[in-house]
Amino acid sequence: MEQCRKSFPEGFLWGGATAANQVEGAWDADGKGPSLADAMVAGTHQLPRRITLEIDESRNYYPSHSGTDFYHHYKEDIALFAEMGFKVYRMSINWPRIFPKGTETEPNEAGLQFYDKVFAELKKYGIEPLVTLYHNEMPLNMVTAMGGWVDRRSIDCYLRFAEVLFRRYKDVVKYWIPFNEINDLTTAVGNWNHGGILNHGTEDFSHQVDDPDKRYAALHNQFVASAKAVLLGRQINPEFRFGTMICHITVYPLTCRPEDVLLTQQEDQLRNCMSGDVQCKGVYPYYAKRYFERNHIHFDVEPGDEELLRRGTVDFYSFSYYMTNCVTAQKDAAQVSGNIMGGAKNPYLKATEWNWQID
């Protein structure tokens, strides 16, 4: 019997990850514009998070405004990463720190200089950067002026942002993720934080008004933007490597009833598999097309989009894991919360004080 390894193999990239909107703070420093994350008020166990397009720090607490103050303490933080033995650090670049409104033609040099210093510090400790281009940091102006990712113009704005980074860091960064947890838009909670969609003035983050046509239009535009970014990046540096990034919530049928088993299969396909299939294989899978048809979901696919998806596939598959869910057709089944989405309560698992089940 082969013994379990007691150490990582040579070249294994062990490390950690952050999102710019969660750690940087300095939300309006050195020319940075507000992002959609900057408009989200903190919640409590009793009160859900809210979205406020008018940012008022005198009345509300916005977590992204301070984060962990990585903007001013990146040197100490990266030194700690090195002390932990990090070989890779996954980070995102805050879009409105580079293009404050998202629609400018010239980038904010002060923002770029900050990331210059971060990459130099990582190099000092031999830590490989893995850069996420979009981690729920769309410039707030693009949300209010365009309606977020539903508008096709967002693709060009994103590509302008991506090109600046690809050219500036073509000899610094090898690994790129165009979109964090791109499959978030297969759920209603993804409307705001991933799509920049504010349906009918939705303010309650946990109970957003959902328009599936808009949501899947935004997701399609992100698929196209990702494919275009991959193709552009490979022109700039053929050694670049791009990956999909999926929020994978493992699902189990609550019972052996055929209805529960079938519903679990469908949930797994749509939430966990579809987005990875599009980005890795370059086509919408048959089950996605069937889902759109059965649920009367319509969005525009422009001439050339399908060819772009075929050509702009990614090189690697990455995912995040939070917890599992159970799925059932029973309407009265006990429910639990979770990150991004909840589900039916698994009677065999314990739960945190936030009602996330532990497994």
Regions found by a protein language model. Give the residues of each.
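Acidic/polar N-terminal loop/beta-strand segments that form early-domain functional surfaces
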Residues: 17-19, 92-96
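Catalytic domains of carbohydrate-active enzymes, especially glycoside hydrolases
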Residues: 73-94, 128, 312-316
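Active-site mouth loops of central-metabolism enzymes
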Residues: 59-73, 150-153
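Internal amphipathic alpha-helical repeat/solenoid segments
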Residues: 66-79, 100-101, 111
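A common structural microfeature
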Residues: 11-13, 71, 88
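Active-site region of glycoside hydrolase catalytic domains
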Residues: 2-58, 82, 101-103, 109-359
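A short acidic, glycine/proline-enriched capping/turn motif at secondary-structure boundaries
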Residues: 87, 96-98, 136-138
